[in-house]
Amino acid sequence: MDQMKEMEQLVKQLNEYSYKYYVLDQPIVSDKEYDSLYDQLIELEEKTGHVLLDSPTQRVGGEPLKKFQSHQHVALLWSLDKAKTAEELVAWEQRIKKKLESNHEIEYIVEYKFDGLTLNLTYENGELVQAATRGNGVVGESIIEQVKTIQAIPLGVDFNNKMEIQGEGLMAISTLAQYNKTAKEPLKNPRNAAAGALRNLDPKVTAKRKLGAFCYSIGYYEGMEFETHIQMIDFLKKNRFPVSNYIKSCKGIDQVIEQIREVEAGMKELDYLTDGIVIKVNDLRTREILGYTQKFPRWAIAYKFEAQEVTTKLEAVLWQVGRTGKLTPAAQLEPVEIAGVTVSRATLNNWEDIQRKKVKVGCQVWLRRSGDVIPEIMGAIEETCEEAVEIEKPQHCPACDSEIVHRGVHIFCPNSLSCKPQLVSRIVHYASRDAMDIEGFSEKTAEQLFEALGLKNIAALYELKYEDLIQLERFGDKKAKNLLDAIEESKTCKLDAFIYALGIPNVGRKTAADLANYFGDLEKIQRANYDELVVLPDIGGIVAQSIVGFFEDEKIIKSIELLLAEGIKPQHKMKNRQESIFSGKTVVVTGTLENYGRKEIQTLLEEQGAKVSGSISKNTDFVIAGDNAGSKLKKAQEILESGVETNLQILDEAAFEALL
């Protein structure tokens, strides 16, 4: 047999065995037989000097990386809203029905909420070309070499177009127990073990952990159409992705609640950590209608299992100063394991919280964790507090010794100009990737600039010179020049990035983008009053007050003036909606286009003033149909044939380009 054909046959055979073993849990050959075939494949690869892309030998882990590279996701990875009671789930369904203007029964899909590390897998031309962490939902870190060591994740699929598969990297509880039998340093819990392995620069370390994974959604896809979430899951199964056996369809929220009770009763039998249930609307067209809030999809929610509680000793309380000057008490605890995670820190919200819970240093406290990384102290065990020490209310800032001020239940340091934690946090936020994106700027750098160079405001960043930086510890010629170049490049920035960089309370990335798109100009945003702001979608009264109050602050006004004087040029490309036939129209794109990716054509249409939708109705104005257009094109044709009054037009790619 030809050596290449023999390699192809071995790869196919070994991948089939791995799929049966790691995904279906149905081993069909002995380890000895598998190893023998694997050794034959290695021998052939060495002889031919050729390695097939989906060869299992690619999973062993390559050389250690120097650092993780950033990766921008095609589709946003959203967070989920949360519910803790059946009443909150009922209220969620009521909000959905109100949005849909319908009281019809809704079909939901119920799945486990796994407690591991979120993965976003990119496939092109049938190959796994990228794997990344969630990051901030827009940009994550590439961990493809680490993910390749997960045997359950296919390196190749029978689908050639681009797609992003969302899932969770995990370590089974039984695998952790087996690993710890021979480990020099035993791992404390499966969640940290999985996250630590996937974020280890050395893929060989990842491989030793023998991680698993479950895939649960397709965030982005080209050249295919789905009508339901179940169809997505069937596609994943067909292409041999690891999918949880627990996926239930429920008619109405009452059935969902029944399922949750069943799962809670049996969750201790699971071999993977779960901290809740995810409930999703099954119909994708309904999802399009429901849309998204500023943070969450309206069509999905996470139900968090009843919190677990343990007791431990409160060893100390440290007051920390944040970017806004607010002092927050952080509890240091005797390490304890709760819900599969070892914790040594916990939340105490403010001084009133400390008094209400009657906690003291040295006493035993009740600790609750409900899916959150940082648990909460619920109260003290009174009989352990006799010899404990009262927590002192700060009278001065722990960082700069300024006299503190009270605003409601919170304590603030008013020294915003020279209090180190405040200034360092503001500068780090300003330079962050979602803001001014000054590459190579870290919290350590900000601290050095504050302490060694006396940096007292953000605008002073733009006055730094090579001679200033080269004298700093760990700053060589290249690092100094690169940082100065990055600072200079940040002068030309997008308006929404600049707005976010300013650190307006309650204003995140999306709200900053909404402000930029609506007003189109920094000065107009600064002058906007409460009534102008509160009418914007997703900007309520609290956010509007925050924005108005921020831009009325004399220190803020002065700070912005200094930045503009340094040459900062926030720019925003206003959409010219008067010159395009698509201005104000609803457009649906379906199928694969030759000259445009899905994200690219959506951006182009929005710049033309169009509203891009994912569902067809008689109110749709244009359907742009590419190759392999599916149910959406069929639906558009049915509307036209029905004789209903509509402005709907179907365009192929050439007709679309002719109208631009």
Curated annotation (Swiss-Prot):
Its EC number is 6.5.1.2. Zn(2+) binds at C397, C400, C413, C419. Residues 577-660 form the BRCT domain. The active site is at K113. GO terms for biological process: DNA repair; DNA replication. GO terms for cellular component: cytosol. Its cofactor is Mg(2+); Mn(2+). Keywords: DNA damage, DNA repair, DNA replication, Ligase, Magnesium, Manganese, Metal-binding, NAD, Zinc. InterPro entries: BRCT_dom, BRCT_dom_sf, DisA/LigA_HHH, DNA_ligase, DNAligase_adenylation, DNAligase_N, Hlx-hairpin-Hlx_DNA-bd_motif, NA-bd_OB-fold. The keyword NAD applies. It catalyses: NAD(+) + (deoxyribonucleotide)n-3'-hydroxyl + 5'-phospho-(deoxyribonucleotide)m = (deoxyribonucleotide)n+m + AMP + beta-nicotinamide D-nucleotide. NAD(+) binds at D31, K32, E33, Y34, D35, S79, L80, E111, R134, E168, K280, K304. CDD domains: BRCT_DNA_ligase_like (cd17748), LIGANc (cd00114). One of its GO terms (molecular function) is metal ion binding. Disulfide bonds: none annotated. Belongs to the NAD-dependent DNA ligase family. LigA subfamily. HAMAP family: DNA_ligase_A. DNA ligase that catalyzes the formation of phosphodiester linkages between 5'-phosphoryl and 3'-hydroxyl groups in double-stranded DNA using NAD as a coenzyme and as the energy source for the reaction. It is essential for DNA replication and repair of damaged DNA. This is DNA ligase. It comes from Alkaliphilus metalliredigens (strain QYMF).
